[in-house]
Curated annotation (Swiss-Prot):
Spans traversing the lipid bilayer: none
Cross-referenced InterPro entries: Aminoacid_DH-like_N_sf (IPR046346), NAD(P)-bd_dom_sf (IPR036291), SDH_C (IPR041121), Shikimate_DH (IPR011342), Shikimate_DH-bd_N (IPR013708), Shikimate_DH_fam (IPR022893), Shikm_DH/Glu-tRNA_Rdtase (IPR006151)
Active site residues of this protein: K69 (proton acceptor)
UniProtKB keywords: Amino-acid biosynthesis, Aromatic amino acid biosynthesis, NADP, Oxidoreductase
NCBIfam families in UniProt: aroE, PRK00258.1-2
Protein's UniProt name: Shikimate dehydrogenase (NADP(+))
Pathway(s) served: Metabolic intermediate biosynthesis; chorismate biosynthesis; chorismate from D-erythrose 4-phosphate and phosphoenolpyruvate: step 4/7
GO CC terms of this entry: cytosol
UniProt gene name: aroE
Chain positions recorded as NADP(+) binding sites: E81, G130, A131, G132, G133, A134, N154, R155, T156, P157, A158, R159, M222, G245
Quaternary structure (record): Homodimer.
Similarity annotation: Belongs to the shikimate dehydrogenase family.
Annotated organism of origin: Acidovorax ebreus (strain TPSY)
């Protein structure tokens, strides 16, 4: 690391798998920015101390992954509207003695759907599968795209209803119908289905019936790699267009880079390079 390079990192547990250092290194090259970005494995009970240490080292910003997104929102000095709505943060900006929290997950998802996949969300019917932290982090930005309807389903119906209730005011403002449906029998089909669960990791079946799909629906899994494959295979077998969350990963990173550096890096070439690297076993 050169003396002029600003320090950034991603904090999580586990963290060894993170592609973020590679992504941000490419962003820095493409935008001629001088920075150093590293992984930091944080003890489960040591997140607050890790933030203090990072700030003391002169750190300028960090990405936050599981399981610290809720704690990141709580420990920040200021919070964006997205963080206030989601209750979780994936991006921190250090400025003097203050820490500003933001959440770029939903922005990344929206960018990958509308630009990467070329599927508009305005006026469309969207099914959000899951009501945990991943779903909460993206519902606000999805609503801001003015879809006709967003339905939320979850194994625990009360959690789906709670997520709907927490976003009801924004939905009314956007004139979008927002409701919770029965996961096993939603009774409707959708243009876009977003899987925000870890069903594949848990070895379970796809959590919704094929009746939710329309011909040509976009079925999007927020995960990527082997974790997303069962959902993607299911979607393809039923005639949907399947897309994993690798583009979301790159796009949310680009939004974080914009917050830190004031310039949004080109995401398409970085995503293309990343897919090629993963396909080659890197």
């Amino acid at each position: 690391m050169t003396a002029a390079a600003d320090l950034y990192c991603v904090m999580g547990n586990p963290i060894a798998h993170s592609r973020s250092p590679w992504i941000h290194a490419r962003f820095a090259q493409l935008t001629d920015q001088s920075l150093h970005y590293e992984r930091r494995l944080v003890p489960l009970d040591g997140f607050a101390q890790a933030l203090q240490s990072f700030a003391a080292e002169g750190g300028r910003g960090c990405n936050i992954t599981v399981p610290f997104k809720l704690e990141a929102a709580q420990l920040a000095t200021t919070r964006s509207e997205r963080v206030q709505l989601a209750g979780a943060a994936n991006t921190l900006v250090f400025d003097g003695g203050s820490i500003h929290a933001d959440n770029t997950d939903g922005l990344g998802l929206v960018a990958d759907i509308t630009q990467g996949a070329g599927v508009p969300l305005a006026g469309r019917d969207v099914l959000l599968v899951g009501a945990g932290g991943a779903a909460a982090g993206v519902l606000g930005p999805l609503l801001r795209q003015h879809p006709r309807r967003i339905a939320v389903v979850n194994r625990t119906p009360a959690r789906a209803q709670a997520l709907v209730d927490s976003h009801a005011a924004l939905a009314a403002l956007q004139k979008t119908e927002l409701l919770a449906l029965d996961m096993q029998a939603p009774g409707a089909d959708f243009d876009v289905i977003i899987n925000a669960t870890a069903s594949s990791l848990e070895g379970g079946p796809v959590p919704v019936p094929a009746s939710v799909l329309r011909p040509g629906s976009l079925a999007y899994d927020m995960m990527y790699g082997p974790a997303a494959q069962p959902f993607l295979d299911w979607a393809s077998a039923h005639g949907a267009t399947a897309r994993d969350g690798l583009g979301m990963l790159v796009e949310q990173a680009a939004e974080a880079f914009l917050l830190w550096r004031g310039v949004r890096p080109p995401s398409a070439p970085v995503l293309q390079e990343l897919r090629a690297a993963i396909a080659a076993g890197a």
